[in-house]
Amino acid sequence: EPNLDFQFGKYIHIKFMLSNWNFIDKEIESLKNKIINGERVATPFSILSLIDSPNLHRITAKKFVEKQYPTSNSLGPIIKGPSNKKIRIGYYSADFRNHPVANQIINLLEKHNKSKFEIFAFSFGKKTNDEMQKKILNIVDKFVEVSSKNDLEIAKISRELKIDIAIDLMGFTQGNRHQVFAEKCAPIQVSYLGYSGTTESDSIDYIIADKTLIPEESQKHFSEKIIYLPNSFMVGNINKKVSDKIFTREELGFPKEGFIYCCFNQNYKINPKIFKIWMKILNNVKSSYLWLSKSS
């Protein structure tokens, strides 16, 4: 059913995951034209890696959120009660486990000033009990397991816990619960880290970024107000131990001599134009090799 909402972009995205580039230029050109014509042809996540156009990202997100996540008033306006002694910050994610997002925010959670802030983690994902999840459980003031709750229930729980600032770590990535924010789970709602594009949602007030991620000239393509962090918006995990094991070229399947180029991104981020450039480099550098991650 190629004419189903948002499916054409998903189809092209899957082709990139398989490194199937047959007719890809023609299909992407068709995708661009369909977006410009106002058709619902792609999800915001799929379009980020397919087309380098903040304006088309914005148009796609707007079409998507209007259809999938309409702003709701089911719980009514948030009634401001007595202020908490501490500001309550809620982080919302399905990835409080061994996952790149958790690895990025673990130090952030540790560095919050506990005399001024209370930290809540709302988990949409399964309980893994892995090392990272256990660390997060020990760091936050309250770990709220809500994977079995519906979106309205999660928003209601957030209000009952009087969350002041809700931080969505997912955007439109897999496993997201964006409708929680459409139900207005907190007075201030922020997008951070997991998704770098605009949501075009009335529900998200701010996005945290830096001027490399969102240059000032790109602000017009974002519905959110942009909070710029100095230098980098990414925190990183400074406590992560680096392996002290020394790997040999031979055990990894490489000859003793030669330069090894690496790209461990997922396949869908590699396009024919980039790959052609890589092949030119390999052609011009004697005894050079390209090491890719096998993801398909």
Residue ranges and their predicted role:
Residues 98-100, 269-271, 293:
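A generic structural signal for short coil/turn motifs at secondary-structure boundaries
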Residues 103-105, 274-278, 290-294:
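Composition- and surface-driven signal marking solvent-exposed, interaction-prone regions
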Residues 108-115, 272-286:
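Short hydrophobic signal-anchor/transmembrane segments that target glycosyltransferases
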Residues 115-117, 160-163, 259-260, 284-290:
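Short, surface-exposed connector motifs at secondary-structure boundaries
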Residues 253-255, 265-267, 280, 291:
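C-terminal amphipathic helix plus adjacent low-complexity
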